[in-house]
Structures are given as structure tokens and as C-alpha cells.
Curated annotation (Swiss-Prot):
<dbReference type="GO" id="GO:0005634">
    <property type="term" value="C:nucleus"/>
</dbReference>
<feature type="disulfide bond">
    <location>
        <begin position="43"/>
        <end position="71"/>
    </location>
</feature>
<feature type="disulfide bond">
    <location>
        <begin position="253"/>
        <end position="264"/>
    </location>
</feature>
<feature type="disulfide bond">
    <location>
        <begin position="83"/>
        <end position="96"/>
    </location>
</feature>
<feature type="disulfide bond">
    <location>
        <begin position="60"/>
        <end position="75"/>
    </location>
</feature>
<dbReference type="GO" id="GO:0031995">
    <property type="term" value="F:insulin-like growth factor II binding"/>
</dbReference>
<feature type="modified residue" description="Phosphoserine">
    <location>
        <position position="203"/>
    </location>
</feature>
<feature type="disulfide bond">
    <location>
        <begin position="40"/>
        <end position="69"/>
    </location>
</feature>
<comment type="function">
    <text>Multifunctional protein that plays a critical role in regulating the availability of IGFs such as IGF1 and IGF2 to their receptors and thereby regulates IGF-mediated cellular processes including proliferation, differentiation, and apoptosis in a cell-type specific manner. Also exhibits IGF-independent antiproliferative and apoptotic effects mediated by its receptor TMEM219/IGFBP-3R. Inhibits the positive effect of humanin on insulin sensitivity. Promotes testicular germ cell apoptosis.</text>
</comment>
<feature type="region of interest" description="Disordered">
    <location>
        <begin position="178"/>
        <end position="213"/>
    </location>
</feature>
<feature type="modified residue" description="Phosphoserine">
    <location>
        <position position="150"/>
    </location>
</feature>
<keyword id="KW-0597">Phosphoprotein</keyword>
<dbReference type="InterPro" id="IPR017891">
    <property type="entry name" value="Insulin_GF-bd_Cys-rich_CS"/>
</dbReference>
<dbReference type="GO" id="GO:0005615">
    <property type="term" value="C:extracellular space"/>
</dbReference>
<keyword id="KW-0539">Nucleus</keyword>
<feature type="disulfide bond">
    <location>
        <begin position="51"/>
        <end position="72"/>
    </location>
</feature>
<dbReference type="InterPro" id="IPR000867">
    <property type="entry name" value="IGFBP-like"/>
</dbReference>
Amino acid sequence: MQRARPALWAAALIALALLRGPPAARAGSGAAGTGPVVRCEPCDARALAQCAPPPAAPPCAELVREPGCGCCLTCALREGQACGVYTERCGAGLRCQPPPGEPRPLQALLDGRGICANASAAGRLRAYLLPAPPAPGNGSESEEDRSVDSMENQALPSTHRVPDSKLHSVHTKMDVIKKGHAKDSQRYKVDYESQSTDTQNFSSESKRETEYGPCRREMEDTLNHLKFLNMLSPRGIHIPNCDKKGFYKKKQCRPSKGRKRGFCWCVDKYGQPLPGFDVKGKGDVHCYSMESK
């Protein structure tokens, strides 16, 4: 029996490793940590009996377990080979990493544009997503202006110490008027920048809705939801397989879950199942002739 490509839990584990830090642990591994825990069904004799024979040794240098909660063995990817959420695992001592300098590392892994590289460099993954710390001593313009205003306010009474001096009185009034104009200008600048920022945020949200397809929006909503979970259920989460434009790829899969074998089906670009394909069907489903590029 042909096995279905196990896509779901590889996506969940990689997404959590990137977004939360520590990798997800299997329930029976006994690994301690604060990361989320994935509870997989046991790989007993009944589950292993449903696996196809492992690949022969010459074409397969190393055997590894299926991604996620799968129980069967498959060929491991070698160093330098392309990898991602929907591919097989990298070999021992290797980890799937986004290309160096990739501006969107998580999307690169979802698109299968990662590279199997030495695991000692895997700690760099989080650096792609962590925002740069603010430079020390960087204050806002309004804080600097307030400091200047405070210094000017402290110096202002000195102009009143000269008795019966009309010249100093005129200068004092001029200074007060100038300061008032400066504060009004700063207040207008802050209000204008705030309105401009709100307009840009609204425009970016509108642009996201129009540019990203339904599959991409579902995937991002699911990954955002995973940030707040401390425990994952293999039955409760589905991460779709999206193309580069954010629409659904023709082939969607559910992974193996211990005793329960995975399955695949074909959909259109909006995620609707195509007629003639049984969603619960077993074995491999060939949608490649219709695969969107």
C-alpha cells in the first residue's frame, strides 16, 4: 500500500520551532522543556504492519521515520538537498534550514526551498524571526523635544530677573510665542504621522487580502493560533499545502497518525474537492498533471 505524504505534523513542528523556540517533543520521549507537546498515537505492531517495506539499501543511504506522527521508515535527505515542510526528513546530524539571507524563512520552508545543513548551525533559524533590539539611547523626537522644552522653561524665568527692562520683556514674549508655534507644529506633526500610519496599516491589510489567496490566509491564521497552544492534538490541526500565490495546491494530504494511515485528495485552487476523488481514499493520489505552477 502506498503511503500518503505526511505533511501536517512536519508543518506544525517546524512552525512551532520557528515561532516558539524549542522544538516540539514526542509524548513518549521524556524530553523536558517549556515547548509545546505533540501527543502521537503509539507505533505498535498493528501500526507497523501497515507500513510498506523500507527502501533498499543502495538508493537509500539512511532510513528515518516519517515526519510528524508517522511510524513507517523512509529515505533520509542528504546534506545540501532541498527540503521543507512537505518533504522527507534530513539525515542524522542535519536540519532543514532556510537559505542564508532569506527574508521570509518560514515561507521558504513551506515552499520546500530549505536546505539540509549541519544541525550545529540550526540555532540561526530563530535569528531570522527575532526583531532587532532597539539601539540604546534611542528616544523619540517628542521626548527630545520635551527635554528641550524643559530646559527652555527652566531658563525662561531668568529673563524676568532684569527689572524694568522693556527690551528683555519683548524678547521674553517673542520666545514664548516662538515656543507656542513650535509646540503647535510638533503636535500637528505627531497627529499627521499617526493618521498616516493608520492609513498605511489599513492599506497593507487591504493589500494582504487582495494579494494573498485563501490557502495562504488559512495557513497564517493556523500558525498564529499555534503560538498560543501548549499542547497539540494530532486530530485537531490542519495546515494546507499552498502555492506561491497563496492558493491551494492540487494535492492536499492528511498524515499518518500511528495506526491510522494518511490519505491525499485533489482540490481546486480555492480548496474545494475535485469530483471523482474520494477524500477518504487510501493509497497515492496523482494530481501532478493538474499541479499549478
